[in-house]
UniProtKB/Swiss-Prot annotation:
Mg(2+) binds at K177, D179, E180. Involved in catabolism of D-apiose. Catalyzes the decarboxylation of 3-oxo-isoapionate 4-phosphate to L-erythrulose 1-phosphate. The lineage of its organism: Bacteria, Pseudomonadati, Pseudomonadota, Alphaproteobacteria, Hyphomicrobiales. GO terms for biological process: carbon fixation. It comes from Rhizobium etli (strain ATCC 51251 / DSM 11541 / JCM 21823 / NBRC 15573 / CFN 42). It comes from the Bacteria. GO terms for molecular function: magnesium ion binding; ribulose-bisphosphate carboxylase activity. This is 3-oxo-isoapionate-4-phosphate decarboxylase.
Length: 417
């Protein structure tokens, strides 16, 4: 069985709405039909497993009831037979998720959990590299992978990007990425950008033995064009790509993963429209399962004290979600903490994510805007993580670590990174 948990908000009966979801999303329609036999329903009809009442509300998520109407709320578990859906993710999205938002009689519905049976394990490839592969390719063990982003996000020409990358790879950083907004614009075609950047990365590897992982933006609405972008990166010796998962969709991701030799770094831009209203959409816990099955290797999930709307608690639950095996540990992608990060968030990130160092800690301005330059910025972030793991307050550790001290002086007001 495939089990979904729906958080229902309705001025009517929760039980009635639960039954309606189970019926409408499986065998039922607005009137009984001759073909809806008991035998058919026994095979493919969804059924309500449990209803857990929640506190009533007075403010509707959707404006379909007058303000101050009493609204009943509950978490409802509904099970769908595997025979009714199969293991196709587009079928799962359509049957168990897509149609529920249009059902009449609710003022809000949010999907808060999804449990998939073992059949999904073998039906989808999952991550090709994940945590272990990302560590192997960056050569980083015993600490978080430290990354940065090319800034400004847009406008740099290939030779200008390469100049900045040359400075960054000399800083000791482990990972660099194109901003998610940069793909292949006329002023910086991907082919030219790759040709400008990769020789610097390979030359640095030849001299030092360290190959910095660079994630190029290869997303495209045409899967064939996206695959050609992939091949440009791979042929030049690259090993990572930024993929805007909501823009390319399930089909694009599936097409890419089956043919990919690159680490696939998932950026979820656009995700907010699916989750920002707490009474509608879905939890990240549900959303991320689709993309992990499809094969993302690294998953960007914001961080602590970010520059966007998402609260810290949401990041913590997202981190837990991607770090929890669907079926086994190999299907966990590398969590990527980013957005306004510098070393100052390292202690809280470490403590609130289960004291793990298995993450990519992504700092844009927190590295490139350091008063001592990018190399000092990288050292400051590394020092912050050393302090976090050792349980030493940053201010104490900074007394003997000038790069961290300078970082605290610049960024501790929360406005600089």
């Amino acid at each position: 069985m495939i089990t979904l948990t729906y958080r229902i908000e309705t001025p009517g009966s929760v039980e009635t709405m639960a039954d309606k979801i189970a019926s409408d999303q499986s065998t039922g329609t607005f009137v009984p039909v001759p073909g809806e036999t008991e035998e058919l329903k026994s095979r493919v009809a969804a059924r309500v497993l449990a209803i857990r009442p929640l506190e009533n509300a007075r403010h509707p998520t959707w404006p379909e009831s007058a303000p101050d109407t009493l609204l009943h709320r509950a978490d409802v578990d509904i099970a769908f037979p595997l025979e009714a859906i199969g293991t196709d993710l587009s079928a799962l999205m359509t049957i168990a998720i897509g149609g529920v938002y249009s059902i009449k009689g609710m003022t809000g519905i949010r999907i808060v959990d999804m449990k998939l049976p073992e059949a999904f394990r073998s039906a989808h490839p999952g991550p090709q590299f994940g945590i272990a592969g990302s560590r192997r390719l960056t050569g980083v063990e015993g600490r978080p992978i430290i990354g940065t982003i090319v800034k400004p996000a847009l406008g740099l020409r290939p030779h200008e990007t390469a100049e900045l990358v040359g400075e960054l790879i000399g800083s000791g950083v482990d990972f660099i990425k194109d901003d998610e907004k940069l793909m292949s614009p006329a002023y910086s075609p991907l082919k030219e950008r790759v040709a400008a950047i990769m020789p610097r990365i390979l030359d640095h590897e030849q001299k030092t033995g360290k190959k910095v992982m660079y994630a190029f933006g290869i997303s495209h609405a045409d899967p064939d064009e996206m695959m050609r972008n992939h091949d440009i990166v791979a042929a030049a010796g690259g090993n990572c790509a930024v993929v805007n998962i909501n823009s390319i969709g399930f089909g694009g991701m599936s097409f890419l993963r089956k043919r990919s030799s690159l680490v696939l770094h998932a950026h979820r831009n656009g995700w907010d429209v699916l989750t920002r209203d707490p009474g509608a959409g879905m939890d990240f816990k549900v959303y991320q399962q689709f993309w992990r099955l499809l094969g993302v290797d690294q998953f960007q999930i914001n961080g602590i004290r970010i520059k966007y709307w998402e609260p810290d608690e949401s990041f913590v639950s997202s981190f837990k979600a991607v770090s929890t095996p669907l079926f086994d540990a190999a299907d966990c992608p590398l969590p990527v903490a980013g957005s306004g990060q510098w070393g100052g968030q390292a202690p809280e990130t470490y403590e609130r994510t289960g004291r793990t160092i298995d993450l990519l800690y992504l700092c844009g301005g927190g590295i490139v805007s350091h008063p001592g330059g990018p190399a000092a910025g990288v050292r400051a972030v590394q020092q912050a993580w050393q302090a976090a793991v050792a349980g030493i307050p940053l201010e104490v550790y900074a007394k003997d670590h000038p790069e961290l001290a300078a970082s605290i002086a610049k960024f501790s007001d929360g406005k600089g990174a």
